Amino acid sequence: MPRDFPRTRRVGEQIQRELAELIRDELRDPRLGMVTVSEVTVSRDLAHAKVFVTALGGSDEDNAKTVEVLTRAAGYLRKLLGQRLRIRQVPALHFQHDTAFDRGDRLSRLIDEAVEEDRQQHDDDKPDNG
């Protein structure tokens, strides 16, 4: 696992906040719905930033389209970030779909199913008093 450096983490957090605002307020692409910027990891030399995004309520196709739209707008977003951030060089933005939400949703459904099966099993094991 790569070592975490305080400066890269701070820059990543600031880029995350600013990008979320810029995507919401500045991008006017009709293909872009509600987008969550869930994490930004910045390389040690601050040259590259991986931006993890999810289209809210979106399918895999919607998420792929969102990543494509944001990738095409990366230069514009980088320019806007340069106007807001106080760093010498704004990292190149690399957008990726964040699968953590999907995995969390899947785990939640599996847990719900297991609880329901356990409840049914428990109800079947009860003796009939009547």
Curated annotation (Swiss-Prot):
PROSITE patterns: RBFA
GO molecular function: ribosomal small subunit binding
Compartments where found: Cytoplasm
Superkingdom of origin: Bacteria
Keywords attached to this entry: Cytoplasm, Ribosome biogenesis
Gene Ontology CC annotations of this record: cytosol
Cross-referenced Pfam families: RBFA (PF02033)
Example GO BP: maturation of SSU-rRNA
PANTHER family recorded: RIBOSOME-BINDING FACTOR A, CHLOROPLASTIC-RELATED
Record note on quaternary structure: Monomer. Binds 30S ribosomal subunits, but not 50S ribosomal subunits or 70S ribosomes.
Protein task: One of several proteins that assist in the late maturation steps of the functional core of the 30S ribosomal subunit. Associates with free 30S ribosomal subunits (but not with 30S subunits that are part of 70S ribosomes or polysomes). Required for efficient processing of 16S rRNA. May interact with the 5'-terminal helix region of 16S rRNA.
Family membership noted in the UniProt record: Belongs to the RbfA family.
Protein's recorded name: Ribosome-binding factor A
Species whose genome carries this gene: Alkalilimnicola ehrlichii (strain ATCC BAA-1101 / DSM 17681 / MLHE-1)
Lineage, top ranks: Bacteria, Pseudomonadati, Pseudomonadota, Gammaproteobacteria, Chromatiales
